[in-house]
From Swiss-Prot:
Upper lineage: Bacteria, Pseudomonadati, Aquificota, Aquificia, Aquificales
Gene of this entry: ybeY
Record's keyword annotation contains Metal-binding: yes
Function, in words: Single strand-specific metallo-endoribonuclease involved in late-stage 70S ribosome quality control and in maturation of the 3' terminus of the 16S rRNA.
Membership in a protein family: Belongs to the endoribonuclease YbeY family.
PROSITE patterns per UniProt: UPF0054
GO biological process: rRNA processing
One of the record's GO cellular component terms: cytoplasm
Gene Ontology MF term list: metalloendopeptidase activity; RNA endonuclease activity; zinc ion binding
Protein name: Endoribonuclease YbeY
One Pfam family linked to the record: YbeY
Binding site for Zn(2+): 117, 121, 127
């Protein structure tokens, strides 16, 4: 249930064009994800980019010279700032589109899935450490995805 008094700051940067994935769609679906996670008064940055740019970022920050679907960069708390800084989620739209076709989702569904995944990483969830942590993260991701898919 969305709280009308909720005040989040959602910054959207689209480096690639998509008629289907608009800034409004990204902002609205991010707000719903934050609401599902009971997060209020947070700031988050969402960037849609291409495979080449995400490859560069992946190489620089993770040492992996290849494109990927989503990257997350958590922020440190800033004392005295109006919002709790969650961090940045970067999604490769071409990668997401190819992945959606491969697994049988619409592009909007795949972007939703990647946003949930990225935001969970910002909150400290991890699926690469051990199977137990992976199960916790993916169960929550699936729960939020399943609930919000019908609202697309």
């Amino acid at each position: 249930m969305k709280n009308k008094t909720q005040k989040n700051r959602i910054l959207i940067n689209k480096e690639v064009y998509s008629k289907e994935i608009t800034k409004k769609f990204l902002k609205d679906i991010t707000e719903k994800i934050l609401s599902e996670l009971n997060l209020n008064n947070v700031e988050i940055s969402i960037t849609l980019t291409d495979n080449e740019r995400i490859r560069e970022i992946n190489k620089e920050w993770r040492g992996k010279d290849k494109p990927t679907d989503v990257l997350s960069f958590p922020q440190d708390e800033t004392i005295g700032y109006k919002y709790r800084l969650l961090g940045d989620v970067i999604i490769s739209l071409p990668y997401a589109k190819a992945q959606a076709e491969e697994i049988g989702l619409t592009l909007r569904e795949e972007v939703l899935r990647l946003l949930v995944h990225g935001i969970l990483h910002l909150l400290g969830y991890d699926h690469e450490t051990n199977e137990e942590d992976a199960k916790i993260m993916f169960d929550l991701q699936d729960k939020i995805f399943d609930k919000l898919t019908c609202e697309l």
